[in-house]
């Protein structure tokens, strides 16, 4: 069963078409990376999924039921924008308030569980206003986990975090899918981090889905290349273009060769031409470069 099944979804705000005939499929249990530039329609789509906005047209099914179904709506955890917390209250008291809003009876055990899941069990007595950005985001996720949701919708939860905060967030999201058995829809502009956790991707542009794929399909679509440095970038690029089909130069002078060729053969060829290679290695393009090329920003 799919967690989310969207067909022909559109949303207009006056004359602005925010979402345009969008089709989208999120399998149950996936960590679905939702990708697009600012204004592409990501947040609008997420808000329609959560019932915070009404579609102009189209359908949204969650676990085979209409997204307005009361039972389904009660099983969606949401973190869109900043978590709504009282700054002078402790983390624990904010969690208790949220549990009361959700009419959770005897919530202490569940609150302790979700705080442990998001690595915040040692900060329960801290005032919310004294928490770091990363801690606040994890508190927001803990609130979204109250009530044991089947679907978790997170809008840009890792933006602005430092390296350690991102690492913790990766661990938290992985634990959530394993221990709560819920599906995670997550949007982010930090594609390098998203690539480390996502099992599926959807890329949206101008309100339309332009590509959906699994992590395995992304891996297959991202070519391996040989990278090298010689200190004579542009000159060597011209030399190599005479022998190989796809040769590119990065801003720092690194040359990339995308042909199916061995690095030792490249070194030998350049040696014959009187060029000494200072560094050479094999690498693979990732999600960020894949996205840039898909958007038409391919380097020449």
Q: Which ranges hold each PLM region?
A:
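Glycine-centered loop/turn motif at secondary-structure junctions
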Residues: 103, 119, 243-244, 274
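ABC-family P-loop ATPase nucleotide-binding domain
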Residues: 1-10, 297-300
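ABC transporter nucleotide-binding domain
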Residues: 170-258
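Hydrophobic side chains in well-ordered alpha-helices
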Residues: 72, 236-239, 266, 270
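Short, surface-exposed acidic/glycine-rich loop or hinge patches that mediate macromolecular interfaces
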Residues: 66-67, 231-233, 260-261, 285
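ABC transporter nucleotide-binding domains
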Residues: 4, 11-186, 191-205, 209-211
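C-terminal coupling/interaction segments
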Residues: 258-300
